């Protein structure tokens, strides 16, 4: 590998070492940084050499590109965890921000990722030229709509396992100009080439920064000159084989030296550096809190590992005997939320008092047990009050002692007051809780039965310490049925969505004590429900309840109807009597039934979910779906119905020789790539089965990881900022947008009532699983497939409604072949008719035919024949053919694409002499008469031409024509006093151009911003007349895409021409300003493909207007197109910018200046300028747009360009150029002028890609253009003229003829 290729990134390495002073000796370590909202927050990175932890830069919505200019942190070389960028507006590249970032270690990852770039709306390239290693973790680059230069990065040079990277949803590669330095003739050596993912290419981060590739053994770093560094260096070094000269260390760093292991007396910290025991003892994970760091097995850890603890003042971790004790000093701690318990995690000994006041919350018990479950001792008191969210105190599962060093009100060690939903005390009784001093107090706990409290008295040894008032039987358990009688259900009836119940009458001792009944019910798939389901009292996982009034008659049995319920669902149900206790000393009594389990009847299922389809052959479709959300029974089978759909007959109406066609594709869903091979159908006879790698077990894991990442990332965003979530989008299986409207009409009706499909039989099948293989289908045909879910009760309740999908089988390879041979028949002088048969069973519809014919010794010509044209004669009529021997072959184009060519057929066109040997005598007789007639016609034509040319506008550059008549003021004259000059805009070919204001120029406007073109004060009278005459040419033009003339000031000096103001200047300057390295870059993104096509359409529209006006431009180039404030491109300046770009012109043989790099070959050879030559120039303008205004034919002198083009040369194809634009250039650069398209034809090809506003203001859609095109079309009766490229006849508008 050539060493010079290292220099582009070697400069960055040298800058990195210089910015770090003496290498690793001056490292400044910063903790994890979360930088958000304000760009100024980035200043926290100012002195950081290493971010020990993660670096997150996110949520800067108000930032602009200007905010990041001049902002750079060259000292930063390492991030030990991960680097995350998310929604930072205005940031276009990281190359200036982190020019020397060398290593991302990935010690801790963001769910497996070390580098995450997510939803960065303005980022154009990653731009980390110094990055040499991502030691652990994958890379995730996703949803960055402007991000390019991803295909030029070899991630294998940075990561040990790049296969898990996730790089999706960024700018399409074909829309990016991913060109590396030195590749397109730029100065210096090109970047190194490597092979990654099976593709060998140049490797770079940006168009000016190569990716560093060291010539050393894999994994070793190197110096800027290519010498190998020490094996412990990572990312680069300043001296070879010196562990003190590394940019970063491969393993460990200590006192400026890179080492494989820490020296004796030091300990590894954060997997990258060594620290002493003293430094480890002073480290703090959270500033301000006591250190918990310990040394374990040669590493300094934030906490001792599980089962180990620090003993006394020692920093070393020792193994615990049993549960590791952890003492937590809390004073008096009030716990009013789960978060308040987090600092008690792992505590076994709480020194102080705990007060629980949990008024609200959901599902608290698991979190409380996780945080408080290890507490064994509370030295003070435990007070639980107003905790309405608590149902049980079982989360204190290890609590053994409440010592009572301090007590509530001086008396109470355990104080439980006003907990409306507390029902159980948990495992305190069985665990043997001890309260050595003080009393216990229970009051206003209406659901806590007294027997639980009395048991606690016995266990804790507090019986007899407290009075009856301190455990009040009237306020504890008064709303719980602590002593109950059993109720029995006497009747039940189940239906699909309801259950009817009746139970026996209940009569308490006092009839007035019975108030009502409450029926509790809930879904219970298993028969394991308990009365106390759900860990809290806030409704989570709790029972549904229904209040039932007492029956009016005492002899009537109470009952209830539970509705609405889900079909075929098991419910747990019990009923409880609500009673009062009126007797003074009697315990609260009640009645309750046992829990019974009832199942509702089945019903029809809901529709199957997520149906997808693919085709693996021309006769098979594979369909897969998911079960219905509500099965409403046991699914026994699925009913699958399918029907062939008729092709859209309207396709025959269009002429696809002149109109583009978006072909439908056979159905394929990438989700099928993960399915099992059992779904694969038998291959077609004569075809080899495709070889697939056996599905590995890693795919489900990767899929699960993907789901987990998305969830975790959304959780992170939820905590970062509240962002409204977009509604779910409904996506269609259909891959063919042209058929959307038709498909929606079909979907509106039922399958069996399809209007256009009644001729095709509906077929059906029953399948037991969520998949089906449909066989015996017609090739490349669309089918509608309906799936119904049927359960075990389908015979009574029916199957589900249908879910459906449209799918198309694959094409048959030979179906579009033309049967038999092509026949021919002479059809008169210089003409022949070719006949052939249509394919009997094509792939869909036959839309057109292509005939490739050639005369012996000449290039082949391709003629396109629409199906309608073919149908008239069963072939095609070729006319105006020169005499000679010909060969021809035909192929058909169907909905699936092109078929195969037929065998060639030969025919001949006879010479006139062969047809009529007596023709020579007639010729000799009439020649003198014909000669005199031709002389007369030539004379008349000469005088007519002189008269016609007096109104023909051709060239507009001063060197192209001579001055004639003096200028006469007319209605375009504007008084000089109405004009005010504001500032200079630049130099034109006649003089300075100014920005100004014109008063009263347009109706309703007080003043109008204008461009003012002037002529030099020293200009001659001839030059002033030329200046005004050139402006007069534009008086006849009125087109939105041609710069408008607004007026002339010819009286007095200086002479002024008033033009429409184009604030963004000429197109060439505008394109060059969009280059990333441009000093005058306005902060706009580089043009996307849609922007390029819009520019091309606007220029073509202006040129089509000029062609319709019989105007030949002769100098079409980006420099002569202007850009308005809203980025509309217009034909303008008409040669007035020539002096500004004088190097674009060349003086040939003492003649005027010529723009040879934009000129057609016929213009260079013979001086012929027509609309066809303007089309050639238009192709060069397209090339300028794609390359951001590079000079055409770079590396060739003007003389060389002249010879190159005249010898048949054209500009080379651009790498990464969009295919659509490359095809347009190829059409424009046909060496035969008649083979080039007209500007209207160009617009025909791209009209569907232009913005809707184009239709409102363009010449192309104007009635004038439509009338002009109609007058140029040949009639159906005319014979076929010699075809141009792609079969389109030459319909170019009449031009002004040759220019000189």
From Swiss-Prot:
PTM description: Autophosphorylated on tyrosine residues between pH 7.9 and pH 10.5.
Domain Protein kinase residues, every copy: 979-1254
Glycosylation sites per record: 47, 100, 311, 411, 492, 528, 616, 634, 756, 885, 898
Domain Fibronectin type-III: 483-603, 607-707, 818-913
Residue positions, PTM Phosphotyrosine: 1145-1146
Active-site feature positions: 1115
The name this protein goes by in its record: Insulin receptor-related protein
Natural source organism: Mus musculus (Mouse)
Gene: Insrr
Top-tier EC class: transferase
PANTHER family recorded: INSULIN RECEPTOR-RELATED PROTEIN (PTHR24416:SF338), TYROSINE-PROTEIN KINASE RECEPTOR (PTHR24416)
Effects seen without this gene: Renal function is impaired, with reduced ability of the collecting duct to adapt to alkalosis.
